[in-house]
Every structure is written in structure tokens, then in C-alpha cells.
Swiss-Prot record:
GO terms for molecular function: structural constituent of ribosome. CDD domains: Ribosomal_L30. Part of the 50S ribosomal subunit. GO terms for biological process: translation. This is Large ribosomal subunit protein uL30.
Amino acid sequence: MAELKITQVRSTIGARWKQRESLRTLGLRKIRQSVVREDNAQTRGLIKTVHHLVTVEEV
């Protein structure tokens, strides 16, 4: 299965609670921190919630 590299590029200051929790669920806490996750429906839903705070690349 394909994997996605997700990098946080913007701060969570001023973000809503659901957006902060989505980033924590993805494993992101700091700007420029990256994680690799499976490309599935759950991950895509979390990314959709915080698409303006992260960048996504296929690995």
C-alpha cells in the first residue's frame, strides 16, 4: 500500500480544537516535523481537516 509523508508547515496557534487534535493524531507537534503514514481513508480524513497546515507527498 502507498505511504504519505506529511509535514507540518504552519502553527496551530489560532487553530480550532478539532484541527489540533487531528495533528496530534497524525503524530505532528512541531513545525517542519514529518511523519510517514499509510494512505488510507482515515489518514485522508485527518489530512482533509488540516490541509492548510500541512504538506503531503507520496513516498
